[in-house]
Design a protein with these regions (language model features):
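Short glycine-rich phosphate-binding loop at a beta-alpha junction
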Residues: 78-86, 155-156, 208, 397-409
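N-terminal glycine/serine-rich phosphate-binding loop of ATP-dependent small-molecule kinases
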Residues: 1-101, 224-234, 425-427
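Conserved phosphate-binding loops in N-terminal lobes of ATP-dependent enzymes
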Residues: 24, 66-81, 137-145, 151-164
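Active-site core segments that coordinate phosphate-bearing ligands/cofactors
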Residues: 2-3, 14-15, 119-131, 142-158, ...
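Active-site phosphate-binding/coordination module
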Residues: 70-139
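Enzymes and membrane/adaptor proteins characterized by extended Gly/Ser/Thr/Asp/Glu-rich
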Residues: 169-178
Length: 476
């Protein structure tokens, strides 16, 4: 694919970017020296309690996606395509094209049963040798094992693939997101049918795999009428982190990245898997990147801890909290604050976060900070300490020095977190772009359309030319 010549017209695409707490539809505008985003629609996303467990309000989510796309087309009639990225691991089950039930939320408690049943059949060490995936209790293969309705399904689609199907009628599994399921062979990068059979997971429901940049299909007539244009849907790096890493302006192999939102995904890019006892014990994962590289990374709890704490305080106060003011007060806290294990399993569920963090602090021998500013600072320093530990592990396990950390996503706006990460890692942090995920989504679409150059290095060079990161130097 060739890039647009100098002086070429700016092109436009629509990016659907879905996170665990909110979703957005954005217009991306791309040219030789242009890479811009315009927010068209933002809407909440989250779990709902049902008699069957914790599920996503998927009908509302999809309706908001369609409305957002229609609004984008009205605002920018020259939009040429649609790309969709979302969080990993969760899925919908179809039978004869109909969604059997709203998708389960990855924090639903049924996953613990799935873990026990999977590991009883295939030990984790054997799983890791086949899929290279870190242990997370909500990985898709554990969810499939715990889901009684897989036997009724003819197709299982991860969230971005499910939305693409509802828009186009085309069923496919985008490869970067498929690599997070635990059912993709880390060597062949295809479905591990033997593993699925060993786990009692119906392999017939696993759809054909496509690579990022594939044109999945055009909108169905009904969707084209609702959205207002007959557009193709292009498979991007549909795992949001895969899209984010496309837009990390790394220029050398000694750079690491942190994609920070609800989660912090900390890692480096490598060409071949590192399937050692050390990487397994460090819980490092191998997820596929947009152009076939491996995102060698570790999941760290991110801003979830702070956002859940603020949510609890707002419920207690009956009023919104001024987050910038809270962060300013946190940055002004004088003296050390206690640092706790941000990845403590007791902090993974929603609700009562300040109480549960206080319990973790006491259990780890710390006094609970006095006042909300100090409490928030303790949370931020604990997240930064977890980031720094993961950076050190990435360097040791990959065998390469880390001289720069690129921190992208919503966390790049948190100056306290960026500085604390630099301080605790001893490595300079370059913060931004904040919208790396949507930018990566847009870039892959644009490349398929022939609007930008074809290599990952050239795509990142465009990010560098159009977005200036903020540098945080480690303090002694």
């Amino acid at each position: 694919m060739t890039g647009a010549p100098d002086g070429a017209a700016v092109r436009a695409v629509a990016a659907v970017d879905l996170g665990a707490t909110s979703g957005r539809v954005m217009i991306g505008r791309i040219g030789p020296q242009t890479l811009e985003l315009e927010l068209v629609s933002r809407f909440p996303n989250g779990p709902v309690e049902t008699p069957e467990g914790l599920r996503w309000d998927f009908d509302a989510l999809f309706e908001n996606v369609v409305r957002g796309l229609a609004k984008a087309v009205r605002r920018e009639p020259s939009i040429e395509s649609i790309g969709i990225d979302a969080w990993a691991v969760d899925y919908g089950l179809l039978h004869d094209g109909v969604l059997l039930a709203p998708p389960f939320h990855y924090r639903d408690g049924r996953t613990s049963r799935g873990v026990e049943e999977v590991h009883a059949r295939v030990p984790f060490s054997d799983l890791y040798a086949r899929n290279g995936l870190q242990f997370l209790p909500f990985n898709t293969l554990y969810q499939y094992r715990a889901d009684a309705r897989t036997s009724d399904a003819d197709t299982a689609l991860l969230i971005p693939d499910l939305i693409a199907y509802l828009l186009t009628g085309v069923r496919a599994a985008e490869r970067t997101n498929a690599s997070t399921t635990g059912l993709l062979d880390v060597h062949t990068r295809e479905w591990d049918i033997d593993l699925a059979h060993a786990l009692g997971i119906p392999s017939g429901m696993l759809p054909a795999i496509v690579d990022p940049g594939t044109v999945l299909g055009t909108l169905t007539p009904g969707m084209a009428a609702r959205i207002g244009a007959d557009l193709p849907v292009i498979a991007v790096g549909s795992h949001d982190t895969a899209s984010a890493v496309v837009a990390v302006p790394m220029t050398s192999p000694d750079a690491a990245y942190i994609s920070c939102g609800t989660w912090g995904l900390v890692g480096v890019e490598i060409a071949e898997p590192v399937l050692s006892d050390a990487t397994r014990e460090a819980n490092f994962t191998h997820e596929l990147g947009v152009d076939g590289g491996i995102r060698f990374l570790h999941n760290v709890t991110g801003l979830w801890l702070l956002s859940e704490t603020v949510r609890a305080w707002e419920a207690e106060d009956g009023a919104k909290i001024d987050l910038p003011a809270l962060l300013e007060a946190a940055s002004a806290v004088d003296g050390p604050v206690p640092v706790f294990d941000a990845n403590d399993p007791s902090l993974s569920a929603p609700g009562e976060m300040p109480t549960r963090i206080a319990d973790v602090l006491r259990a780890q021998g710390h006094a609970v900070p006095d006042g909300r500013a100090a409490f928030a600072r303790s949370i931020i320093e604990s997240i930064a300490a977890a980031f720094a530990g993961a950076i050190r592990s990435a360097a040791e396990l990959s065998g390469r020095p880390i001289r720069t950390i690129h921190l992208v996503g919503g966390g790049s706006l948190n100056r306290v977190l960026c500085q604390a990460t630099a301080d605790r890692s001893g490595v300079p942090v370059l913060a931004g772009p904040v919208e790396a995920t949507a930018l990566g989504n847009v870039l892959v679409q644009a490349r398929t359309l022939g609007a930008v150059p074809s290599t990952l290095e050239e795509l990142r060079a465009l990010v560098s030319r159009t977005h200036s990161p903020e540098r945080y130097t480690p303090r002694p």
